[in-house]
């Protein structure tokens, strides 16, 4: 039966004139198959790190797939096709040799044709390198630098754990997510430790208008500060890194100076006067490299300093205000908020990694699915072909046996015929098995890395055993211990998290955040180990209680960890369970309010169960007493005393789990016992209610105390305000008095000046009068005086008339 029509014939015209002239033996074909498998086993592919592989070829060339090339001809000629002609030639030669060796069986040729076509299809689907990128010699597959069997390299010539990377100058403005700049030194007046929301920071204290230095160094040797334009901004110490606003004067001044090599930059910073609203606030200086044309920040070339606090004088550093101690509830809330924030950051990082892997590995996943489908199809075709071939061989063997039997029956007697039949069958079976084994060996040598098919028998019962290799099935199968599965996975996650670089904008505190997350993870691991130890203790308790079988053990109670009615370790186990519940409720504040009602419900259920058990015990005792005979009445007082003792100590009887009665009890006494049990239960219930009331009172007292403290604080605040108002009034009065005194002094000075001016003016007036009198002197000897002054009055001039 011909099976070659299921496969397409291969046109050898595309591969030159080598397909028809070459001929090799079966041994050479087997050796070539083993060499190809060895070369493929050296190939290591990591699909999840495909985005980290370096493209060493030219930019216009496409990146090679992670599959070695088998385009090596024995004569050393190069071939640029997608499938090596050597594979096709060897497969065709296998067909020829098998046809020459096994002419007696026609179906063996069909088997070889099917298997060889299968290998050619497989090689054409997997070997798809680009043309002219790999050489033909087998040595170049492993020794050449462009071969894909080399280990995976990281982009920009760096390893996974190295903090620094190198890149070409063309990638400078685009950049990568890695930091290429770092702070080597930051000067300050004093360095303080400051904690907020459970996060501790190193704060650098700086005096305003006084310079402090910041030294930057490059991690990329291809960069140079002489060719870069840095820019510095003053931002708030927050997640958003908002820039500090300014109206007229910029809050920050800076001067830059680079060394001769250009790998180190010194910045002299000077913070100006800030408003009063920004006192006691933390700032940061953001240094970024800017494009000189567009003034836009270049990605990967920015750095943020440590937190900075500004003071007006150096003396203010020594004067630290005494801060009031915070309440423990506030600190707990801060730590919970910090844990929530860290969990959100971890979820964000995990989502980022997950989406990154999905986006980068879609093509590889599609290729893997296609390869798996092809493998399945090829395996099914191989199985069907082998089954058909084996059936055909069996039919031929049966026909040959029948022909031989007929010939032997015609020539010899019955006894000789039987012997000849056995010998002929043995010879035919040996020839068929040898031919089948040879064909199957050739097929297995060509397809050893995909499927291993072993034909154990060529008779009616043929067993096909398929063994997939490590390249197909046994990849990425994690083996974890049953006990430490969660713990080991958690530790691996923490190790990977430590290796991650700082992706947050807070570059200075990124490493600190990672360390805090790692410390929290270590504490969680310790808690898990403690839980395991406690669980082992619980198992030991169960073993101890389970060993004491008898009257003390009864039906299994779902609430108790063991099968005993009264477990001696019950209190310890309950205490451990309560501690676990309280601890886990700390991390779920929404469920914290439901702890108390759940505990009260559990107590009520336990009480109801105890009452039911006591009632059942009483009923059993009544039945036993009705069966027994009444005894003498003289023993009644003793029975009453025993009953009273039993009523006083019901808990001890429950712990022992046994009640022995040997006397008769009246129904009245039974009623009294029931009443006593009910009273005891009521007393227990009352005690529980009292305990609850006491707890409520205690909570109310604490609430009142808190209110009183708040009122006292409010009163203190009012007193402080009043005191401040009084001081302000006194200061105003003092200012007014000073102003009045100044006015008085000014008035006095003015009066003095006026007096001095008047005193200076008085002698001048006298001199003027004297001058006037001198001018008014009359010469009586001359007669012209009367002519000049006809109306003169001598009395006015001080002269008397003669």
Swiss-Prot record:
Record GO biological process: cell differentiation; cell surface receptor signaling pathway via STAT; culmination involved in sorocarp development; positive regulation of gene expression; sporulation resulting in formation of a cellular spore
Membrane-spanning residues: none
GO molecular function list: sequence-specific DNA binding
InterPro entries linked: CudA-like
Keywords: Developmental protein, Differentiation, DNA-binding, Nucleus, Sporulation, Transcription, Transcription regulation
Chain intervals with Polar residues compositional bias: 69-88, 129-142
Region (Disordered) location: 1-148, 154-173, 381-446, 636-658
Disruption phenotype: Mutants fail to culminate. Development is normal until migratory slugs are formed, but slugs lacking cudA fail to culminate in the dark or in low level unidirectional light. In overhead light slugs lacking cudA eventually form defective fruiting bodies that lack both mature stalk cells and mature spore cells.
Tissue: Expressed in the prestalk cells that constitute the slug tip (pstA cells) and in prespore cells (at protein level). Not expressed in the band of prestalk cells that lies behind the slug tip (pstO cells). Highly expressed in pstO derived papilla cells during culmination.
Subcellular location: Nucleus, Nucleoplasm
Induction profile: Induced by acaA in the slug tip. Induced by dstA in prestalk cells, but not in prespore cells.
A GO cellular component annotation in the UniProt record: nucleus
Biased composition (Low complexity): 25-63, 89-128, 381-445
Protein role: Essential for normal culmination. May function as a transcriptional regulator.
The name this protein goes by in its record: Putative transcriptional regulator cudA
Species in which this protein is naturally found: Dictyostelium discoideum (Social amoeba)
Origin organism lineage: Eukaryota, Amoebozoa, Evosea, Eumycetozoa, Dictyostelia
Gene name as annotated: cudA
